[in-house]
Amino acid sequence: MNRIMLLVAFAAGVVAAGRITTNQDRVQGIDRMSLEDLQLQKFILDIVQNIRQPLQQSELINLDVGLIADSQRYRGGIDKVMHNVIDLDRQRRLLDEHQVYSVGRLEHVQQLRGIYRLLARAQDFDTLRRNVVYLRRNINPVLLVNALALAIRDREDTQALIVPAVQELLPELYLDEEVIQQVRSVLREQTQRPSLMDIVGMRQRAMNPVMSILMPWREIHMQMALRKQQNIQNVLGQKRVVVRAENQGQVEGTSLLTDDIELQNFVQNLIQELALLEDVTQLEQSQLINNDQREEQWVGRQRVQYQDNNQERDLGQDVDTGRLLRVSRRRLLEQQDEYQGQNIYGNQKDRFQRLLRRDDDNDDNDDDDDQDIRMGRVQLQRGISQGGLRIGGAHNLPTVSVNSDRLLHVSRRRLNAIQQDQQQDQLNGRQRFMGLVRGDRLSEGRRVGQLDDVRQERQNNWQKQDYILTQGRTFGVQQERQNYADQLESVSRDDERLVHINRRRLNQDNQDIQQQQMHFPRRINSIGEGRRVMGERPIQDEDILKLIRGENRLKLMTDDEILEMLQRNRQQRLQKHQNDDDDDVNDDDVNVVHRQGLRSRRSLPNLRQQNNRLSEIVLHNLRQLVARLNQESIAQGQLIEEQQQLINNPRLTQSERYALRLNQIRINSQRSRQVLAQIGQIEQRIQEVIGQVLNQVNVNSLRGQVIDQRQVESLIADVLLGRLGQVGIMTIIRQVVQDNNIEQIDRTGLGIRLSDPVVQYTLRRIVRIVDEQREQILGGYRQEQLQMRGVSINDVRVDKLRTRIEEHELDLSNLVEQQVQGIQQEIVGRQRRLNNKAFTIDMDITSDQDQDAIIRIFLGPAEDQQGRQGASLDERRRDFVLLDAIQVQLENGRNRIHRRSIDIPWTTSDVTPLVEIYRQVMLQLKGQQAQQVVGIQQLVGENGRFPQHLLLPRGRPEGLPMQLLVVVSPLVELQVQDVVPAITIGIGSASLRDARPLGYPLDRPIHNEQELLQLTNVLLQDVVIIQEN
């Protein structure tokens, strides 16, 4: 017997020697935290506990010193987004607790981005702590929790800390109103109050009449104290209250997937990432254009350049010059907009009315105010007053010290403007009117009869300046520019102070060039870029070559050289455009090391951060989400494609199509036509924008290597993010919400839920349009792009896949206020959900050499969306989900790879309740002083990953037929690592290290399924999923 046991142990050791395990400890246990980390963790828990209630801890309240606005306390200084949040806080315009936070609103997303940067870029944890305490007491709790979770995730000194799950901190965001009222009614029933009969004493014994006269309220106080003591005993006897936190019919259809709280949190995180990655929208661009136009009208382009040079010459290197320049320019525009288009007498009348209202506020100083009015000594509003009054708005403005550097630069700018006005008046020989002329604005001291003459003179001056700037051939203007240039200080081209104004001047130069090209076109230009000839056919390089030869240009170059030059120029412009987009969108949100007190040189290539894979990650998550919806529908026998084919039947009339669509998406008939028309317009806009973007790219050059083909995927993803074409998915979501917010509304403020049929229909259509555009351009993979020589998959073994419906508990203590002081009552919501049994995948792979490889594992249904068995893999590939991607180092010979489902990195297990996290932290803090606490489990908090219990679709009692696709490919690492984080939302790090598309190889059409399955590095195996209960 002993010999048999030895043989078995020896065999197990031999097998284990050739096994490659990929089980990695992804979560740090609390028992390995240092004392400092435990104290920081306790601070985070104190902040988020009872987030809806006012902060009670005095030691935390003492840390509130306001929002820190010192640029030296932040890595990289304070940028425009952060400064906008600081200004909103000074004006008390940040989102407060009485307002609803929504990622569908642009201003809310901008506040989230700014608060996140204030927390993530804090120089030390003390700055982070003070800002968090101030924000905890002054802003919306949903906004604070989202920003804090992102900052804790991205900071280097908080990697060991966790934030409790959002669904426990803010459960009202994910529960229905009926569940919330049920929880609060249960708590009201436990808190008994004395009845009226008890208060008046009719049910009590009669007391001494003398005592009742001397102490009339003694009996009432005794009864109240007795009732309160009974309530405390009731609560002590029932510390755990369990309520049912689900709706009727939650296990029907796909509701187990769409109504799952963890999945709703994942979708909210995905939409939040979409909002944070969204580029400048049409609203922002229109605002920027309007600001530039107003600035050119009132100040003049020559004056702006001259003053910018003077300011940049005088500013020091250690000062945040870009912020000061933007502040002064913004204030000048606000001041001009306030008085633009108003009547002169109306301005004067309104100012005196504001002055009288100011007198009412200070009744004690009426005599002094009257004297100030008579003497003309009244407080000015952000400007210089000569011969007129400019009163009002001083109470709402932030106070600034008289020694502040901001006032120095703003005053110097205004002084230069006044001097230029005087010089311009002397040159033109105009008479000075009474009052101050600022930026060609009419003074209040001018007479009304002179209004038409002055306006005509100003219009003539504008036309003359515009003509001079457009033609650029007036000797006097050139001489004046030369004189200005001679007076400026010469600085190095790499000087940090020039970075902030280079982009603005570059845009102005481009506008000048475009205006000159309208009158004098250049000899060599981008001929016909984006235009179409011969009907709908886009212009090609050969057409441009014909135009060049027809005009007898570039005679010394051959046709091949001209075509090569056009192709090279187009690729350079495309690469430059992508780099500029990557710098503008999210270059500050990745982990970038900045020098303290200085802004990063975003225009320099050595610090440019490539993050274009972020758009691919978002698009990949959308595809995977739609595939899971399709899998759940197929598992429940809901035929999607059958209804789609009926809708697209050409024999049906338009009214019949509308009727079928109404039956499919089940929306209100009164708004059905508007919603469907809006969705149709969205689909058309997406197709047009993607077509325009891809027509500007030389697709023939991208059909070679797989790395080059990924650029098409990145371009399409940029369109969905709104970075190209201005038709991003957030714009689509906002439009759908606007048309669908009457009946389908949730407490997140977004207005949509994944269970909404309109949302599912829109997502499916968007993903289908994107896939069709990509497949039409790139086609399928070639055989050499799919095979891996010298590698063969011998066998793949999978455990039995089983799913079950179970009851899950959710901590709802933050949903209600604790009525009893000193007693923390645990309120638990019980909900049914779908879960799966943990399984393992064993793969036996043979390699002829040592090499790095990546293994992709896909899971998809064996049936198509019409319920047909035996459908081709090409018809079902869009319904496959990427279970895992593993990076391994294959050795020469046989390799056994063992993978557990609980080790998939982009999924998360059940979160630890807030009460349990707090208890473990406090026990560990005590253990640091006395003895270590043994047996502490790993804690799981908010991480934004996909819930692990939804990894498999709901099975069937007889077994749901599924297929497992395993593909082994050589690892093609990117030369420049685009995405550094090890784990991102919905995707693992192994897929990001590989240069192939994230959906490879099922993201392209499969023309020959047999040829694909005959490859030695590809294996397709049948599996079944059984529903236990």
From Swiss-Prot:
<dbReference type="Pfam" id="PF03722">
    <property type="entry name" value="Hemocyanin_N"/>
</dbReference>
<dbReference type="InterPro" id="IPR013788">
    <property type="entry name" value="Hemocyanin/hexamerin"/>
</dbReference>
<dbReference type="InterPro" id="IPR014756">
    <property type="entry name" value="Ig_E-set"/>
</dbReference>
<protein>
    <recommendedName>
        <fullName>Fat-body protein 1</fullName>
    </recommendedName>
</protein>
<dbReference type="InterPro" id="IPR037020">
    <property type="entry name" value="Hemocyanin_C_sf"/>
</dbReference>
<dbReference type="InterPro" id="IPR005204">
    <property type="entry name" value="Hemocyanin_N"/>
</dbReference>
<keyword id="KW-0732">Signal</keyword>
<dbReference type="InterPro" id="IPR005203">
    <property type="entry name" value="Hemocyanin_C"/>
</dbReference>
<dbReference type="InterPro" id="IPR036697">
    <property type="entry name" value="Hemocyanin_N_sf"/>
</dbReference>
<feature type="signal peptide">
    <location>
        <begin position="1"/>
        <end position="17"/>
    </location>
</feature>
<dbReference type="Pfam" id="PF03723">
    <property type="entry name" value="Hemocyanin_C"/>
</dbReference>
<dbReference type="GO" id="GO:0045735">
    <property type="term" value="F:nutrient reservoir activity"/>
</dbReference>
<dbReference type="GO" id="GO:0097009">
    <property type="term" value="P:energy homeostasis"/>
</dbReference>
<dbReference type="GO" id="GO:0005615">
    <property type="term" value="C:extracellular space"/>
</dbReference>
